[in-house]
């Protein structure tokens, strides 16, 4: 609905905008900041609110004052809740698993989106400094690796080896979740690039912390080789030719989920190093997604049942979100040059919230 097309696939733009506004209004109105007892300020709600808020932001000129107010309440409440929550870690400094079998990288990285969205939308808010410090802390923590604890490096003025209380990613950039090296969770590195792009869209310099270990984690999908044995046959990289996904330690959410990776590929095509071949993988996964969709006449992607994708809370919706993110990310590949903020933020808390 943000394009200039007046008619697409038989649906007029005005109708799409009207439906989008209804969704934005309905979701934001039911947030706890607007409706006592409503949803929000809990697990994954930072991701839900950012998805809604970005849609509102893209259509801001079409929202009335009341709609803008409830969106603002939602965004600011989620950013403040995230700042209070602070970073969490999979392992402590000694390597002991604090949350056995489950990295916190997904939760920490999607939490990052809330303060980033708030910064982008409300540049004069009294909580702006706290949102920025919170976002920097979450970005550093999200995909921190064991080797970071011994390296001499400073990110936004923060001595990582000295200050980091734990780690979330494996040394090779992969992520452990559900007790296995899990590509479905490694792809959450897109949240760092998504947050960075939100700031770019607001013409705000992006803290260097937003890119911390991101390229390394993407290589866990596109470059890292898994030998078989000990990993499952046939071995190789997670990203296989023709858009297929190899799961080195088994399946969590389904055997055919190419759309899950289109979003991260879209951002990687903008931000990762050329040798990751992100553009080629983006095209392969998008083609495979389209091939799945062409099996049906109703626009859906997945077959009924749980074999291809078992996510019961909206597998089609999640696929569409990833495709939309890839499209949006692509618009920034040759967009305005990004400004990176290398300033020091010595009061960032890596061990607790605000």
Predicted regions and their residues:
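Histidine-centered metal-binding segments
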Residues: 218
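Long, compositionally biased, intrinsically disordered segments
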Residues: 13-33, 78, 230, 234-245, ...
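Aromatic-lined, polymer-binding surfaces characteristic
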Residues: 1-214, 223-228, 240, 244-259
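Terminal, non-catalytic domain-edge segments
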Residues: 1, 121, 129-142, 177, ...
């Amino acid at each position: 609905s943000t394009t200039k097309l007046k008619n697409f696939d038989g649906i007029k733009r005005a109708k799409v905008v009207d439906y989008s506004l209804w969704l934005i209004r309905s979701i934001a109105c039911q947030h706890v900041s607007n409706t006592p007892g409503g949803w929000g300020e809990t697990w994954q709600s930072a991701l839900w609110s950012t998805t809604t808020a970005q849609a509102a932001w893209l259509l801001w000129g079409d929202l009335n004052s009341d709609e803008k107010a409830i969106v603002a309440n939602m965004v600011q409440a989620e950013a403040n809740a995230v700042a209070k929550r602070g970073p969490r870690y999979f392992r402590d400094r000694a390597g002991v698993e604090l949350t056995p079998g489950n990295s916190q990288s997904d939760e920490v990285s999607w939490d990052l989106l809330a303060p980033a969205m708030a910064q982008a939308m409300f540049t004069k808010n009294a909580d702006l400094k706290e949102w920025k410090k919170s976002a920097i802390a979450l970005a550093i923590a999200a995909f921190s690796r064991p080797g970071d604890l011994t390296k001499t490096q400073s990110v936004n003025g923060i001595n990582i080896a000295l200050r980091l209380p734990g780690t979330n990613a494996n040394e090779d950039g992969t992520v452990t979740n559900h007790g296995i090296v899990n590509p479905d969770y490694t792809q959450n590195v897109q949240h760092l690039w998504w947050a960075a792009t939100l700031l770019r869209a607001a013409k705000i310099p992006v803290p260097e912390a937003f890119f911390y270990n991101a390229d390394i984690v993407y290589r866990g999908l596109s470059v890292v080789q898994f030998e078989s044995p000990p990993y499952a046959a046939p071995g190789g990289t997670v990203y296989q030719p023709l858009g297929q996904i190899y799961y080195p330690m088994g399946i969590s959410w389904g055997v055919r989920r190419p759309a899950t990776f289109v979003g991260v590929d879209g951002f990687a095509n903008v931000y990762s190093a050329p040798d990751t071949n992100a553009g080629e993988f983006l095209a392969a996964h998008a083609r495979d997604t389209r091939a799945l969709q062409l099996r049906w006449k109703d626009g859906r992607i997945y077959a009924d049942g749980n074999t291809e994708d078992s996510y019961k809370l909206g597998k089609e919706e999640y696929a569409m979100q990833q495709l939309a993110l890839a499209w949006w990310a692509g618009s920034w590949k040759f967009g305005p040059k990004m400004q990176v903020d290398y300033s020091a933020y010595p009061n960032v808390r890596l061990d607790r919230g605000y």
